[in-house]
Amino acid sequence: MVSKRIQKALEGNSAIRAMFNEGREMAAKYGEENVFDFSLGNPATPAPKALNDAIRDLLDEADAKGAAGSLGIHGYMANAGYEEVRQAIAENLNERFGTKFTAHNLVMTVGAAGGLNIIFKTILDPDDEVIVFAPFFGEYRQYAANFDAKIVIVQPNLETFQPDLADLEAKITARTKALIVNTPNNPTGVIYKPQTMEQIGAILEKKQAEFGTDFFLFSDEPY
């Protein structure tokens, strides 16, 4: 018998995932060209040729080294990910944004969902609050519930779908632990304006001073 927590989670299984599965079944029945899938934000374009070529090169190099090379490709690695990969990402970020990251500032995870769950496990206590901007990716609610925390929803401006910043300020409490910013947004595709982001930062600083707490700001950027 599975736990009551999992039973409850299964009863409220992701509508987005259900739509995706239904879409796959309909595509098999009626043809891919006749079904338009607006569920998961799945990539609709192939991987760049340069990426495919780089993967082939890695596999060819591994084959040339024999068993040792093969183990280097599919064996265990450091928990944070390959250091040379993290360093390359850090250098790219530094070049683009004028930051000073090193490999030690980065941790690689298997997808953003895994990353968010790890972070939530690290920072959340029961009844802590995580703020999201509506409309939002529905799985955020379950990620918080995994650690007995609560999602607090900030409403949008229905004309622009930018966050209602007055509502944000009203929703922050002493139990607020984190805010998730997802831009371009899933599901609307809206990109939050630079001035919106600046105002969000100012509100967070104001509320941190008011409550004497620290908030974590998560930027979820799959798109």
Provide a role label for each language-model segment.
Residues 34, 213-214:
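A short pocket-lining beta-strand/turn micro-motif at the edge of beta-sheets
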Residues 2-111:
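N-terminal small-domain helix-loop-helix segment of the aminotransferase-like
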Residues 61-212, 218:
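Conserved core of the PLP fold type I
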